[in-house]
Each structure stands twice: as structure tokens, then as C-alpha cells.
């Protein structure tokens, strides 16, 4: 009896192991499947491919603003670690699907691709060395991860750096 139960249990587990399809590990992002797709369809989470990136984003003392401009979007970033350790800058952001190409105006060579995840913007963990010129002391923009607080252009346009300069404008 115990043996028959063990065999039946193994067969049930084997049936739960998936359909035999291999996961796409080529680096190409496919359409969301399973739970994520169901959540997007139900409206529980926003579809990053169809969401506007405009808004004010934050986490703790990290702030990002994104506003539309004539040709793309303007982005402003301010990160404050205290003790005069901060980063700040403005630039241009262009979007292709879930990828955001960020270029800071003040610094040649400070451009990189970030991710847009519906209501979050995530910078890569490693940025070009030139981006460190936007920062004082040991502060860094690498790995910045912020969530949207507001979709309002007027709120996003009010973000300032540590010296009181506006980082985003509402257009060119």
C-alpha cells in the first residue's frame, strides 16, 4: 500500500513539472507569461510596454523626475546620502519598450540604458566612469531603483538638486 502511494505521489509530482518547454535564456524579453501576464491583464500591475514614463519617482532620499519634451523626455536625478555626499544632473531619456536610454547633458560619456518596470525605473549596477562626475565624494547613481509617486508633470517639474536648481522642465 505504501509503495503504491509513493508511486502515485511521484507520478503526480512529475505531472506538475511543466510542459517540457525550455525557458528562453537568449536574453530576448518575451511577453510576460503566467502570473505576471494575468496580473497585467487584470490591471493589478501596469503593462510597462504601454505605460507613460512621465512622473516623479522616489525611494528614501533618491529622486527622479521625467517630463515630456519636444523630441523625447527630460530626466532629472538627485540622490542625497547626507554629509555632502550626493549626485545630481539633468539629461534626455528616450524609450524603446521597457528600455530607457539616459544621457546626461553636463557630462560627455555619461549615457546608459536603464529599465522601466511599469511604475519603477532601475539604473544598472555599473555605470560609465564619466557618470561619477555628477556625484560628490563617494555617492553614486549606480543601481538606483525608484518607484513612481506621481504621474503629474507639474509635480515632476518641481524637483530640485541640492543647490536649488530645477532638474526637469516641462518642455523645450
Outline where the language-model segments fall.
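N-terminal glycine/threonine-rich, aromatic-flanked beta-hairpin/loop signature
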Residues: 62-99
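Extracytosolic low-complexity repeat regions of secreted or lipid-anchored proteins
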Residues: 113-150
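Sec-dependent signal peptide recognition
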Residues: 2-7
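A composition-driven surface/loop motif
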Residues: 30, 55-58, 73-74, 102-106, ...
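C-terminal motif of bacterial Sec signal peptides marking the signal peptidase cleavage site
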Residues: 13-15
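Bacterial signal peptide processing site
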Residues: 17-19
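Tryptophan-anchored aromatic micro-motifs
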Residues: 27-65, 125, 145-171
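Short, hydrophobic/aromatic-rich segments at coil-to-beta transitions
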Residues: 49-57, 71-76, 95-103, 122
